[in-house]
């Protein structure tokens, strides 16, 4: 267990059609509890990677900045991931991230503006997410380790490669692909997703063949449960779980089953790992069969894409090692 996930808030200023997270009725994690989570992760479990999730983490900017600054005191915190829809980013935040040595900034942007706006709808007077993020792209170019997450729901599966190319054309080159999990997919949409991934594969291979940079995070991540993360998960109420499956509104009743402790009563590493091993069984039992089978099907397509890219990635890595200026 080498990952700490702090769910700092469930609040969000977007209502994405495909997002399962419950947005209302929950507290946000206090800065004190966020720091306690970091201390516990390092002192009891040895540290590793820290991830800040929501909701939208930048809805509680003082917690995010404070806990990131707190993490700097620990050499055993190797990377700090901030996942955001981008609406909270401004010049001040980008300057902070530009000088934060451990940061990986992950921004959700699904492709062309029409698809982004169809599925990622602002609420509460929030601006358009596409316009806001694209308006920052020149400033983002000087922020180290910016990753774009492209979510692909069923209705855009046929345009997955087109949307990916659009993001590349905007100047981004680090990506994370996220097919729509825990929603039903018709078989023809899964076929379209496969074709879309084939198109993305061709774009990636073409860039590598030309010596151009392109990083796909999916090549380096392996989770036992599709979409959801495992590790030491501190929820907004300071309870501790081995997975963040309880973020989903349709799965929140599993929180009682996945809870292994709290910041006041922390679990052992063994307790977290034992409970983590049961998550897929809980999901299969809880979810409608069509939804679970759809999730496995789209995850298999993503796995197929990654496996098809590994040989070329090895060759590209060898080339970059010969030319250090190309290293990501």
Language model regions located:
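Radical SAM/AdoMet-radical enzyme domain recognition
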Residues: 4, 34-51, 60-179
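Activation segment
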Residues: 16, 61, 242-244
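Pocket-edge positions in alpha/beta enzyme catalytic cores
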Residues: 25-29, 56, 124-125
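Short Fe-S-cluster ligation motifs
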Residues: 40-55, 320-328
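Flexible mid-to-C-terminal extensions adjoining Fe-S/redox cofactors in radical SAM and related proteins
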Residues: 247-328
């Amino acid at each position: 267990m080498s990952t700490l996930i702090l769910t700092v808030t469930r609040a969000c200023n977007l209502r994405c059609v495909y997002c399962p997270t419950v947005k209302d009725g929950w507290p946000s994690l206090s800065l004190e509890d966020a720091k306690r989570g970091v201390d516990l992760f390092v002192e009891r479990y040895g540290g590793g990677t820290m991830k800040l999730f929501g909701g939208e983490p930048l809805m509680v900017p003082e917690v995010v900045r404070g806990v990131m600054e707190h993490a700097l005191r620990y050499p055993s915190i190797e990377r700090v991931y901030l996942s955001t829809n981008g609406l909270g980013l401004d010049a001040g935040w980008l300057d902070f991230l530009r000088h934060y040595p451990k940061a990986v900034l992950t921004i959700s942007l699904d492709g062309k503006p029409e698809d982004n706006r169809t599925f990622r709808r602002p609420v509460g007077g929030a601006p358009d997410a596409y316009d806001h993020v694209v308006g920052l792209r020149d400033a983002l170019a000087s922020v180290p380790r910016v990753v774009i997450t492209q979510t692909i729901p069923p209705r855009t599966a046929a345009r997955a490669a087109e949307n990916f190319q659009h993001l590349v054309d905007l100047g981004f080159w680090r990506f994370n692909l996220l097919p729509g999990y825990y929603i039903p997919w018709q078989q023809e949409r899964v076929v379209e997703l496969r074709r879309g991934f084939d198109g993305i594969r061709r774009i990636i291979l073409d860039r590598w063949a030309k010596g151009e940079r392109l990083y796909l995070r999916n090549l380096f991540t392996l989770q036992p449960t599709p979409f959801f993360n495992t590790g030491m998960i501190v929820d907004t109420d300071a309870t501790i779980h081995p997975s963040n499956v309880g973020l989903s509104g349709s799965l929140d009743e599993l929180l009682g089953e996945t809870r292994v402790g709290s910041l006041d009563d922390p679990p052992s590493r063994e307790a977290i790992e034992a409970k983590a091993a049961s998550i897929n069984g809980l999901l299969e039992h809880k979810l409608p069969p069509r939804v679970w089978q759809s999730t496995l099907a789209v995850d298999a397509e993503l796995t197929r894409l990654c496996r098809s890219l590994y040989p070329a990635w090895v060759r590209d890595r060898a080339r970059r090692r010969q030319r250090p200026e190309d290293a990501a």
